[in-house]
Design a protein with these regions (language model features):
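Glycine-rich phosphate/pyrophosphate-binding beta-alpha loops
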Residues: 147, 254-279, 284
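Carboxylate- and glycine-rich phosphate/diphosphate-binding segment that chelates Mg2+/Mn2+
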Residues: 155-259
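Short alpha-helical scaffolding segments that buttress acidic/His motifs in well-ordered protein cores
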Residues: 200-204, 246-254, 268, 288, ...
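Glycine/threonine-rich beta-strand-loop-alpha-helix active-site module
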Residues: 78-85, 92-182
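C-terminal charged capping/lid subdomain of soluble metabolic enzymes
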Residues: 11, 303-364
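Catalytic phosphate/nucleotide-handling subdomain of diverse soluble enzymes
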Residues: 270-309
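ATP/NTP phosphate-donor binding region
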Residues: 1-97
C-alpha cells in the first residue's frame, strides 16, 4: 500500500493556559513534569534581572537554575552551544525541562537549547528543515511580549556562521505555553509596535501567499482582525484588553504560518539581521515599508498604523554597506526559497533577481 505524504502532519502545542495571573500556576504545572530531582532550567530575559520583576515569582526547587540571557541581539548558534555545554557539564543528568521567559528571541533560545541537549554537534548543523533526529527534552514557553508567534511555531530562528535560519522540526514546538496578559505590562511603545507588526506582517504574507489554504486563512484572518483592533481602530479598549487581544493575535498569526509560509519581508529581514544584527521586529518594519509592489493594501494599512502611533522607522541603514556585506545580505535573503515561493510562486527565481533585491535594500 502506498503512503501519501502530500500533506504536512505538523505538531501543535499540546497544552496551553491563558488568563490574567496564569503565570502563578507555573510551579504546579512543572511539578507534574519533574523527573525526580533533575533540575528545571529557566532562561529569562535579562531585563528582568532586577528586584520586583517576574523573576521574583519563579519558585526554584532542588538544584533548579535561573539563567539570564540578553535579547539585545538575535540568538546565535554559538550562544546555544555554550549554554548546552555549560548545562551538560554542571549537571550529571539531563534537566527535567527548559523554560523560556521573554520575547521571541528568548523563547527561540529555550527551544534550541532543549533540542541540542539531546542532539549531538552544533546548533548550526541543524539550521534548516527537519534535520533534528532526536526528540527534545520538555520545554515551556512564556511570552512577555507578543507578536512573533514563537510561542506556537515549529521553528527557533538563530544566526549561525553562514546564515540566519531556523531549526525547523516537529520537536521544536513547545510542550506547554503559559499566556498571561499581565506579563506584557511595561513593554516600551516602540517594542510593542515592532513586535506586534511582526504578527501583522505574518498575516499579510500568509494571506497573500501562494501556499494559502483554508487552515492558514482561518487563523490569519482572525489575527489580522485582532491587529487592526489593537493598532488601528479607534475604540475604548483598555491596555489590559489590548494585551489580551495582542497575545491571541500572536498565537493565531503563528498558527497561520504553521501550515503556509511568510514572504518577502521576512526573507529580506533575515538578511538585515544576519549582516547588521537588526532585530527581527524592527527589521520587518524597515523592509515592509518599501513593499508596496508586493503587498499594496497591507503596506498602506501599515503606514496608517505607523502614523497613528508616531513610530519612527529607521532609514538609510544600508547606505554604507561594503560590497561584501551587500552580497552576503542578498545571499541570505535569496537562500530562503520557501518564503519566496510562497510570495511569488514556483517561478520566483525568474522574478526576484539579485539586482532587484539589491535595489530594494538600497532604499532602506
Amino acid at each position: 500500500m502506498s503512503v501519501n505524504n502530500e500533506y504536512r502532519n505538523f505538531p501543535m502545542v499540546p497544552r496551553v493556559v491563558f488568563g490574567k495571573g496564569s503565570f502563578n500556576q507555573l510551579t504546579s504545572i512543572l511539578d507534574l513534569k519533574r523527573k525526580k530531582q533533575a533540575p528545571f532550567i529557566f532562561i529569562v530575559d535579562d531585563v528582568f534581572d532586577q528586584s520586583g520583576s517576574i523573576a521574583d515569582k519563579i519558585e526554584l526547587k532542588y538544584n533548579d537554575k535561573l539563567i539570564y540571557a540578553s535579547s539585545k541581539e538575535e540568538p546565535k548558534t554559538s550562544q546555544v552551544d555554550v549554554l548546552v555545554k555549560n548545562i551538560l557539564s554542571e549537571f550529571s543528568e539531563l534537566p527535567s525541562g527548559i523554560i523560556g521567559i521573554g520575547g521571541g528571541s528568548i523563547m527561540d533560545l529555550a527551544k534550541a537549547v532543549s533540542l541540542m541537549l539531546t542532539n549531538e554537534g552544533s546548533a548550526a548543523d541543524y539550521q534548516g528543515w527537519d534535520l533534528i533526529k532526536t526528540k527534545s527534552i520538555y520545554h515551556v514557553g512564556i511570552p512577555t511580549i507578543s507578536g512573533t508567534g514563537a510561542e506556537v511555531s515549529r521553528t527557533c530562528v538563530l544566526s549561525g556562521p553562514v546564515r540566519k535560519l531556523g531549526i525547523n522540526s516537529d520537536y521544536t514546538t513547545f510542550d506547554q505555553v503559559v499566556l498571561d496578559p499581565l506579563l506584557l505590562d511595561g513593554v516600551s511603545k516602540n517594542q510593542w509596535f515592532y513586535t506586534g507588526m511582526d504578527c501583522f506582517i505574518h498575516c499579510v504574507e500568509s494571506l497573500e501567499g501562494t501556499f494559502l489554504n483554508d487552515f492558514s486563512q482561518s487563523y490569519g484572518e482572525k489575527a489580522y482582525e485582532l491587529c487592526l483592533e489593537v493598532y488601528l481602530e479607534d475604540n475604548n479598549l483598555t491596555v489590559e484588553e489590548k494585551n489580551g487581544k495582542l497575545m491571541m493575535a500572536s498565537w493565531h498569526g503563528g498558527m497561520s504560518i504553521a501550515y503556509s509560509q511568510v514572504g518577502v519581508a521576512h526573507a529580506m529581514s533575515y538578511g538585515l539581521g544576519f549582516v547588521l544584527g537588526t532585530k527581527h521586529g524592527i527589521g520587518n518594519c524597515i523592509v515592509f515599508n518599501y513593499l508596496e509592489d508586493y503587498y499594496p493594501e497591507g503596506v498602506a494599512i501599515f503606514k496608517k498604523m505607523v502614523k497613528k502611533h508616531q513610530i519612527d522607522i529607521p532609514k538609510g541603514i544600508c547606505s554604507n554597506l561594503s560590497v561584501e556585506q551587500m552580497e552576503t545580505m542578498i545571499n541570505v535573503a535569496l537562500s530562503l526559497e520557501p518564503l519566496w515561493e510562497n510570495a511569488l510562486g514556483k517561478d520566483w527565481k525568474k522574478i526576484m533577481t539579485r539586482e532587484k533585491v539589491r535595489a530594494m535594500y538600497l532604499k532602506m
